[in-house]
Amino acid sequence: MGDHGRAYQHITPEFCHHMKDFVSRGDIITPNLTEACLLTDTPYPEHDCTDPELSAISKKLHALGVKKCIITGCPKGDTFLNYISDSSGNVDTVSTKKAGPGYPGTGDIFVSIVSALTLRGFSLQECTTQAAHFIASCISYSQSLSNDTLQGVIFEPLLSDLVSL
């Protein structure tokens, strides 16, 4: 839906309205901070997001009907914070050191790992930790090969890291 505080060009208010309805039926959603703001009609913070701000955004997502939520990639200094919450009010966070620039497709890899590990019985905190660390490894690896960020991360050589889980 968007990144860095801006909706993608093709995302309309009507699309956002329908997406709110769609995510209301979700057991687990993994919006990035921009997407969470779009879904909750919250202005995107132009500073590192605070825990109270993330709490307010996650409560709005749960008010839509979402059971569990991971707001991904929230910038906090030299780290990215993943804010995990459920509709009962439980909250956890997973931080990873910024490994390099943003790459397209990392959210898709993230949700794929979370989905697979959830089905294997991992807790949402464990899923988030594994996914966040795998993404950071992929970014570092891609940077070491001077991979163009527009090509996405190189993750295939690192897949064996996930097989052992």
Q: What are the residue ranges of the model-derived segments?
A:
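Glycine-rich beta-alpha junction loops
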Residues: 1, 35, 73-77, 97-100, ...
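Hydrophobic residues in alpha-helical segments
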Residues: 40, 118-119, 139
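Conserved phosphate/ATP/ADP-binding segment of small-molecule kinases
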Residues: 7-91
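Charged C-terminal helix
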Residues: 125-165
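Phosphate-handling active-site elements
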Residues: 90-92, 117-131
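Short, small-residue alpha-helix embedded
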Residues: 100-124
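Transmembrane helix exit motif
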Residues: 2-6
